[in-house]
Amino acid sequence: MTASAPVITVDGPSGAGKGTLCKALAESLDWRLLDSGAIYRVLALAALHHQVDISTEEALVPLAAHLDVRFVSQNGQLKVILEGEDVSNEIRTETVGNTASQAAAFPRVREALLRRQRAFREPPGLIADGRDMGTVVFPDAPVKIFLDASSQERAHRRMLQLQEKGFNVNFERLLSEIQERDSRDRNRAIAPLVPATDALVLDSTSMSIEQVIEQALAYAQRILALPLKK
């Protein structure tokens, strides 16, 4: 890890637009990208590939510590590369999700993945997408953004996404699920979902994604005097 490499952290609840913003920032600045939300799924998939016993913390820790993963944004699409292979779709399966939940229960695995995430900090810089990037993982990041939106707006966005994929969805159920997750995330004892005290808080409820990207880029450039990728 190169502590002097700048980091832009983007935290916030699901559906606020963090992923889209982070991909745009990474492409505009030509920086590395970290999708912390995918880390446990990548670890789970690696464990399945290498037939590591997911019920044993001792077996998972070395795998977590040396996880060979990269996140690449190309034309607005995020690719998750595990050991040189594109696993963007594979990490989204139910089996991988269940395995990830088991792995996340181990304290030493969480600590190993925390160190692994910090190792992404390399020149020219890092865009870190998550929920506690600015408060826990990179508390010294020079640029911190907390991207929020109303629960109603986030439920509406999620409904449109699912409908585009051909799913019939109930708005009230989606809204209830989002509000329940918000409550858990904001009130948990360890690493609650809150803005860092020095974060720029952007409410995207009534903003287009283009406006969000423009404001975030302007803020980062003002603090870091960054050139845009040509």
From Swiss-Prot:
It comes from the Bacteria. Its main location: cytoplasm. Keywords: ATP-binding, Cytoplasm, Kinase, Nucleotide-binding, Transferase. Pfam families: Cytidylate_kin. The keyword tRNA-binding does not apply. Belongs to the cytidylate kinase family. Type 1 subfamily. This is Cytidylate kinase. It comes from Yersinia enterocolitica serotype O:8 / biotype 1B (strain NCTC 13174 / 8081). The gene is cmk.
